[in-house]
Amino acid sequence: MAEKKEWWKNAVIYQVYPKSFQDSNGDGIGDIKGIISRLDYLRTLGIDAIWLSPVYRSPQDDNGYDISDYQDIDPMFGSLADMEELIAEAGKRNIKIIMDMVLNHSSDEHRWFVEAKKGKDNPYHDYYVWRDGKEGVPPNDMTSAFGGSAWEWVPQLGQYYLHQFSVKQPDLNWDNPKLRKELYDMILWWMDKGVGGFRFDVIDLIAKEPDRKITSNGTRLHEYIREMTANTLSKGN
């Protein structure tokens, strides 16, 4: 069983960037049906898995790494049914699908963040990282990877939210067990659909400690990863 679960150690993994891989409908954008049409070609290369860059529903502020719905496919790439077909057809050719997964942040258009901005008492408010403050005076001098402050002012709340990337990518609050359970349930949902694995983008940032200006490899990082593995990946193959 251990050997089966560690197939990835010796696997040949081929990354597919969907926008530019294969366009099936002539709109100039690669899509899932295009990938399906090339599976036989990919099989001839001798690959064991496809690492699929983000295809989730997204405003595309950061090439799909700003996810507004983890359980839907962006229309530019097709539909959820197309994704299910890709998983099934790849499986027939002994090719696993590894999905890019972003758990450090979501899009600001995700329903969680839309709700979070409605008030400090909203149950989704604590899904994100907030600090009280004054306009023009961020909590500290942390900077975004994309430049400028990592804090964005929300006047109706009198608070700043943390974004280590684009202002449209608010950081998720992994200290909140309810948030973690939502993410684990979502991962299991994809695993139930037959996804073979995940490539976790910037996973080292999930345990950030903004008050200490620690952005990566925070104190609880290994705790979170062990918990996530126990609740998700350990249940698959």
Annotated model-derived regions:
Residues 2-184, 192, 203-237:
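Acidic/aromatic-lined carbohydrate-recognition and catalytic surfaces
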Residues 190-200:
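Active-site regions of oxyanion-processing enzymes, predominantly non-cytosolic
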